[in-house]
């Protein structure tokens, strides 16, 4: 969720430009259209990463959906734009490197979203027409209709009734192993009840935090002086990604199961029948579902729950409609991303009225100045809202809102607060009279004159990137993020204490360059302003309190807190993070985890990247000209280089270890490793590929040179066989590493024969 403290609004320049593209079907895409398509795809990937990997969406659901649907429109007009790595061909998010990757026995798909009843009817009629073509081989359609829970999709693997693994959906094929955290959820049985369950079965469901429990948990956080969680969905996702299961156990998590993946010996003939079996086995099944015969019945179900969706146990963001019969589901099959037999209807956002008290601005990590509305708190979509982003001055103007207006407020996707516009009929009745918002001309944090980075930019920025306290605070917070150094003890409040404390006047950090050189003594006198609380409620009065040290008494002198000690331990550990994480931490525009991994693989060291030409970087697979320009511009700034040099002097690793004697046998090859190899861990296999000049990919495509298939190879093996990709076992992999592709022809054929008989549901948990 975007907040005034840490906003990341939609790049409306790109959005508006993309919306202005007019193309005719069959006309080859122009260069400008290709550029706009690539920008749109990059935005979708960026926002998807924030949602799935950082559990912190930076735009509303409605804004994301608008970008995504525009991407689909462009691909429909120009199918040649579609590639295997297009966001429209992928499911959900990537797999976080913070958890072990495990491969699902059967792929977990996403759902096709529809945003109006007309769209839902069109989908239903299309499904009915497809079923009609199947003739008498399938029964008449019955619609299993259920609530779309706003939580985190999870896959449970049971063997002989015992829970052996739990994983996130990830990219649909490979997820994160969160078994230890899932075991803390009391509704999930470690051993299935009764009898008749398959010897091996994957059970899919949604982990969520009940609405009432979420409010109570947030109240306890506030009472303890901690920041409340943004919303139940992000809270559930973040809870399952805690490194310590004891922390997860403190969160009020629940789960409802809603599907079955791979199974051996399941006797159910329909979705509804399988739900009855799941209940008999002791699994939690949602009580909010019905099997309906007609589309009119489905519409009544949608209307009924639309009226009372905020009175339910959990948050929902729509209704899922599925064809109930399994045989029909199998006959209709799947696209590359979604089943053809199910869709998710999303309710239009609920709207309420409230008063816009003020419009303030915040300065973000890149200097972007973002206005946000401060409103009289009002309950909307089940929670109280008093604040919403307005993105930029053009959005404020387009919405036509003025300070003092009664405004229409809604939650996009029932999650993200959004100001729709003013209630004009009430404008003249407001006291005091409404006034126009004027974007500041100087940075509210450092006083520097504001200006667009480029003449055509909609956003205005503070150019004082080096010294602006707000930008520094945001960059320090980013350094600690999961995708960068992953420093859990350096949260938002700690970043404020390091860069903008109430005391001393000169903060411990005036540049992130000193982060890894901090000492405990540097933090001894840091005080922050914290609101006094009475029975968990803010009093409006503030006091200065030490942040990094205990208060100290005559009997117990002030000393570093346990969290401070943890911070220094994690800073020391972070120095050994791989090069790609260091690159992410530097806040270089456009350079995220994917580009950083590609750069680290191609160049091996920070110095090599710093000294590379723009052309050399642009030719790296996964980088390209835009990122290459951004890198050269970043390294051309002296104080940026001071950060790199200071971190290096403090012991931060700036080079991935490589053995120069290792031959570059895999130069130009893309190799995918799947399943369990007896003598290689997943990371060891990837490293072996990279140091020999190859690209270690996580997905199989027509560009894959080889698939290395271990035990329990899973769906990647099936795809490789369909595409004719050579398959190697571990012996063939060793031969490839030693001698390159010229020596592996016969081994590849032999390995393919051997690998195809691997039973993908018979082995222990597969790892990528």
Swiss-Prot record:
The active site is at 148 (n6-amp-lysine intermediate). GO terms for cellular component: cytosol. Residues 661-750 form the BRCT domain. Pfam families: BRCT, DNA_ligase_aden, DNA_ligase_OB, DNA_ligase_ZBD, HHH_2. Residues 739-768 are annotated as: Disordered. Its EC number is 6.5.1.2. Belongs to the NAD-dependent DNA ligase family. LigA subfamily. DNA ligase that catalyzes the formation of phosphodiester linkages between 5'-phosphoryl and 3'-hydroxyl groups in double-stranded DNA using NAD as a coenzyme and as the energy source for the reaction. It is essential for DNA replication and repair of damaged DNA. This is DNA ligase. It comes from Paenarthrobacter aurescens (strain TC1). The gene is ligA.
